[in-house]
Amino acid sequence: MPPRMTTQTQAVLLALLAKFDSDHYGLDLMKQTGLKSGTLYPALIRLEGHGLVRSFWEDIDPVKAGRPRRRLYRLTADGIAQAQQLTSSRVGGNAYA
C-alpha cells in the first residue's frame, strides 16, 4: 500500500523526481519544497518505509571536507514510477500547491 499522498509528501516526491538521477540531502530538499525539517524528514522516513526512497550516508571524510557527513536521498524505481504517476495525474498548476 502506498503512503498517504499529502501535499507535503507530493512535494518531496516531485522534488526528488526533478533530478531523479541525483542524490539529495535534507537542506537541498527543504529549499526546493519550502518544507521545514519537522515536516520533511518524517515524510522521507515514510517514503523510505514504503520503498519509494532509499537513503544512505555520504561517503566523505568529515575532517577533510570540513563538515559532517550528509544523509542522502534518492528515489527507487518504485518511487520514480509513483512520482511520475502523480505528475501525470495532476491537472496543471503549481507542483507544490
Which residues does each predicted region cover?
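Amphipathic alpha-helical dimerization/coiled-coil segments
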Residues: 78-97
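Surface loops and adjacent helix of pleckstrin homology
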Residues: 45, 58, 85
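Beta-hairpin "wing" of winged helix-turn-helix
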Residues: 50-66
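Short, charged/polar surface micro-motifs in flexible loops or helix N-caps
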Residues: 19-22, 50, 78-81
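N-terminal helix-turn-helix DNA-binding core of bacterial DNA-binding proteins
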Residues: 2-39
